[in-house]
Design a protein with these regions (language model features):
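N-terminal hydrophobic alpha-helix used for membrane targeting or insertion
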Residues: 1, 28, 176-178
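Short amphipathic alpha-helical boundary/capping segments
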Residues: 1-6, 126, 130
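N-terminal pre-P-loop "Q-motif" helix
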Residues: 3-19, 188-191
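Conserved RecA-like helicase ATPase core segment
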Residues: 3-6, 32, 36-38, 42-43
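A basic/glycine-biased coupling hinge at the interface between accessory DNA-binding modules
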Residues: 19-21, 41-196
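Walker A/P-loop
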Residues: 20-38
Length: 197
C-alpha cells in the first residue's frame, strides 16, 4: 500500500501536480497540511528533488513544528534538510546570510517590544516630541502599519505633508530607523521588510 492511497482525488491532484503553482483552498481540518507533506514526500521520492531545495512556510511555530514532524514521518532520512519554518524564521535565516548587502552586520539583533519602546522613548526625547500628545506606543503602531504596507520613512513623510501630527510621527520614524541601524538592530516588522529589500 502506498502512502498516497489514503488521499482523496482532490488531495492527490495537489500532491501529484508538479508543474506550475498549486493553490489549496480548503477549510480547517480538511487536509491541507496532509497534502503539503505528501507533496514534499512525492517531490523527494518520486521526482528526485533534493530535500534542501524544498521550502514549506507556515504562519505559526506550532504549525511549522507539526509539519516538520509529519514530513519526517513520511520522508525519514534527509527531512532535516527541508526548510519547514514560519515566514519570520525564513526571513531571519536569509538575513543572517545576506543582510550585509544592506549595510548591517550579519550578527544583527532583533528588538522585542520593550527594546522598541525604550528606543522610541529616546527618539522622542531627542526630537522633543511631547509623549503626552504623541504616545510612544501610538508612534510605534503607526510605524508598524507603514512597514506592513512597505512604506519607508521618506515616503511616509511625503504622504503626511500638511498634517502636523503625522509629520511628527514621520520624523520619529526616520530617526527610529536610523537608531535601529546604528545599533545593528531590526524590529519584528523589519525582518520581512529587510528581506524584501
Amino acid at each position: 500500500m502506498s502512502i498516497y492511497d489514503t488521499l482523496n482525488e482532490q488531495q492527490k491532484q495537489g500532491v501529484f501536480t508538479v508543474e506550475g503553482p498549486v493553490l489549496l483552498l480548503a477549510g480547517a481540518g480538511s487536509g491541507k497540511t496532509r497534502v503539503l507533506t505528501h507533496r514534499i514526500a512525492y517531490l523527494i521520492e518520486e521526482i528526485g528533488i533534493n530535500p534542501w531545495n524544498i521550502m514549506a512556510i507556515t504562519f505559526t511555530n506550532k504549525a511549522a513544528g507539526e509539519m516538520k514532524e509529519r514530513v519526517e514521518d513520511l520522508v525519514g532520512f534527509g527531512s532535516d534538510s527541508i526548510w519547514v519554518t514560519t515566514f519570520h524564521s525564513t526571513c531571519v535565516r536569509i538575513l543572517r546570510r545576506f543582510i550585509d548587502r544592506l549595510g548591517y552586520d550579519n550578527n544583527f539583533v532583533i528588538y522585542d517590544t520593550d527594546d522598541q519602546k525604550s528606543l522610541m522613548k529616546d527618539v522622542c526625547k531627542r526630537l522633543e516630541i511631547d509623549t503626552k500628545v504623541h504616545k510612544e506606543k501610538t508612534i510605534l503602531n503607526a510605524i508598524s502599519s507603514a512597514k506592513d504596507e512597505l512604506i519607508g520613512p521618506k515616503e511616509y513623510y511625503q504622504n503626511t505633508l500638511g498634517d502636523y501630527s503625522k509629520q511628527k510621527i514621520a520624523l520619529a520614524y526616520e530617526e527610529y530607523q536610523k537608531a535601529l541601524k546604528n545599533n545593528n538592530a531590526l524590529d519584528f516588522d523589519d525582518i520581512i521588510v529587510k528581506t524584501i529589500e
